[in-house]
Amino acid sequence: MTVGVSRCCRTPLSCRLPPARYASPRPARKLYKSTLAARHDPIFRDFADDPARGGLWHLRLASSNLPLILENQQPFFANGLSFIHNGDISDDRGINIVLNRAYPINQGAFLSTGGRSDSAIFFSVILEYIAFGFALDEAVAQAVRQLRQAYPKSSYNCMIQSQDQLVALCAAGREKTSPRIVEIYDEYGKGEKAHDYRVMRYRDVQDRDGKPSGVVVASSGFEQNESDGWKVLENDQMIVASNRTGEYHVRSI
């Protein structure tokens, strides 16, 4: 499971500080990608300890039959947006969308992502809808509707972040993990963790005074107990959060 990190940072303030402390100047963005597994990457701990008001972490396996190369590592970054995707956009035969030459892709948007994968294609479709004038959350929803016309059973779970906003979407096409995904996990000796591959959960974040100040959204891979405040993000729902105030709401697509 490789590591990719994008953080919206403003040292020395922490992402858990009260919203009123977030003032200009605008925070700097840090982007790091590696093909190393996070547990073996010496930079991982540095990023984990780095204060930030918002961030995306992508510690996932690669899509089926796609190469483990730096260009495909996430987060992707384009037009001031960071994007991560947990899914495999393939048809019932397991043929990935990157091999579908007939699928219409905006080459300019695709090249701007810097990637070559199905996730890069997904991001490029979102970028198109943003260029059409849609708000960030609705651009994500429109992109999923478009891709589902050709790939209805694929997973479109994703997160996208701007300087001001975070959108996290759960949009799986199957109730159970497909055998193909289980096989990929088995290859890495992680087959027992494939059952909740498409599950996303979230919980509130509190500041030092115990007041709500943000939200954490995560996919599977570590314990997310209800007793600790974790709630399931239902299928076809998204969280839309402010990176400035920490306020968020849940909407359907």
Name these PLM-found stretches:
Residues 1-253:
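N-terminal segments that mediate ammonia production and transfer
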